[in-house]
Amino acid sequence: MMRSLHSLRRMSGTVLALMLAAGLPLSAAQAQPAKPAPKGDQKPATPAPSEQFVDGIAAIVNKDVITLREVREASKLASADLQKRGIQVPDERTLQKQVLQRLIMERLERQEADRMGIRVDEAQVDQAINMIASRNKITPAAMRAEIEKSGVTWEQYRKSLRDDIRMDRLRQRAVDANIIISDAEVDAFLKDQERNPAAAQATRAPAPQQPQPQPRQPAQSGPAMLVLAQILVRVPEGSSPDQVAALRKKAEGLLARAKKGDDFASLAAANSDGPEALQGGMMGARPLDGWPDLFVKAAGSLSAGQVSGLVQSGNGFHILKVVDRAGGGQPAQAARPAPAPAPQQPSSFQEGPSVAAPQGPVRVTQTHARHILIKTSTVMTDDQARQRLEQIRERLQGGAVKFEDMARQYSQDSTAPQGGDLGWVNPGDTVPPFEAAMNALQPNEISPPVLSPFGWHLIQVLERREHDVSDEVQRMRARQLLFERRAVPAFEDWLEQLRSQAFIDNRLEKQERLEQNNR
């Protein structure tokens, strides 16, 4: 799937968008072993729920334990981040409840990454740091100084970055790879855009470029951009009609408060079940056509600051707020950005690409390349994958075998039946490590093993050419918009599937119910 736009382009953008955060995601909290309760005659043989809670276990996720210490430390980080964003911090119990939900999902994702054999080594972290520093026009040393000045240790930042890269690779494999946009869908989308000239600007993007750390400038023209935040009241799979009705009532109560004027970000932080709850519900900015149809119908005609009605999806009840919108010259601005040393903002779902219309033909240097991909897994380590490719490279350079034959025999990419042939590759079509290695090759030269988020590659450049890609860029942009439209619900479905298949014993929740019953 090396030429799969939705996986390659999105992975590239996500890794580069890992910014110099002043705070850390909740995964930065270090797990601490639970302390056993001291033995004594005054203790019952089987502790009551409240005593189990005091013992130090906040939740059990499959076979993993989340401790109270983890929850407390992560809550401190979340509280600091909310304050920096200007969002009211929920009361301690509510904050810990939200934080624990986040930790549970992070633990489930981590377990899934372990199962799939996804690992991130020090070299990959260094590579990401160099890219982030380059994008922000600073040296890695200056970047480290800024990070430490914010009160975060360099070791904490590296761990956070490693976790982010690993989770991004997991989501790419588990979610993005399953979103397939057909040529027929692209054709239909472009025809629809022709009937709506204002929206059609969204697909007239400039030629793909290497990512550059350019500050956003006010655009003179562009498509409608929409910045959304949400409050999600999740409806678990298998909920009874009474449970669904109770959750709807809860969502309606939150909607009434939002319509009345209560701060939306604070409501989201305290009540939303969405993965972006502790960012005030902020989902980021995209062209209008990049949002799911349900969201566009509910919020597409609203003005900035307005709140939608209740939106029901397969995951539950959504309340949407239009944080900002722009088009025809006004750039969309993120609401309440967290202070950070770098000019970028974190987002689970990245903003769409540049939308300025090109003037005249769009000419780029295309590379005709082929590759052999060896993926890492529980039975194929990084060292083993690299060594296998080194052995193949030696045989290729000795002239004993042909590249296409080795690709058919060994490559684990979908291009293997075609001898690893990627066709003509535009700038930006592949992830940065792959593209950098490919650009350094002369025609007919074979690279050493190259590490990317997909695994290890051997790359051979066959030829290069200058080519007008105006039509291709428009189709690529349309495909990306269609992908982004599906990404949000697909990600939420995947999270719900992870949760529904897991054993989760939430002791915080049990403790709260016990106290309510005793009142």
Swiss-Prot record:
Name of this chain's protein: Chaperone SurA
InterPro entries in the record: OMP_Chaperone_SurA (IPR050280), PPIase_dom_sf (IPR046357), PPIase_PpiC (IPR000297), PPIase_SurA (IPR023034), SurA_N (IPR015391), Trigger_fact/SurA_dom_sf (IPR027304)
EC top class, as a word: isomerase
Keywords annotated in UniProt: Chaperone, Isomerase, Periplasm, Repeat, Rotamase, Signal
Function (record text): Chaperone involved in the correct folding and assembly of outer membrane proteins. Recognizes specific patterns of aromatic residues and the orientation of their side chains, which are found more frequently in integral outer membrane proteins. May act in both early periplasmic and late outer membrane-associated steps of protein maturation.
UniProt-recorded Gene Ontology molecular function terms: peptide binding; peptidyl-prolyl cis-trans isomerase activity; unfolded protein binding
GO cellular component: outer membrane-bounded periplasmic space
Signal peptide: 1-31
Low complexity bias locations: 31-45, 197-207
S-S bonds: none
Domain PpiC: 223-324, 364-463
Annotated EC: 5.2.1.8
Location of region: Disordered: 31-50, 196-221, 328-361
One Pfam family, short name: SurA_N
Domain commentary: The PPIase activity resides only in the second parvulin domain. The N-terminal region and the C-terminal tail are necessary and sufficient for the chaperone activity of SurA. The PPIase activity is dispensable for SurA to function as a chaperone. The N-terminal region and the C-terminal tail are also required for porin recognition.
Main location: periplasm
Reaction(s) the record says it catalyses: [protein]-peptidylproline (omega=180) = [protein]-peptidylproline (omega=0)
Subcellular location: Periplasm
UniProt-listed GO biological process terms: Gram-negative-bacterium-type cell outer membrane assembly; protein folding; protein stabilization
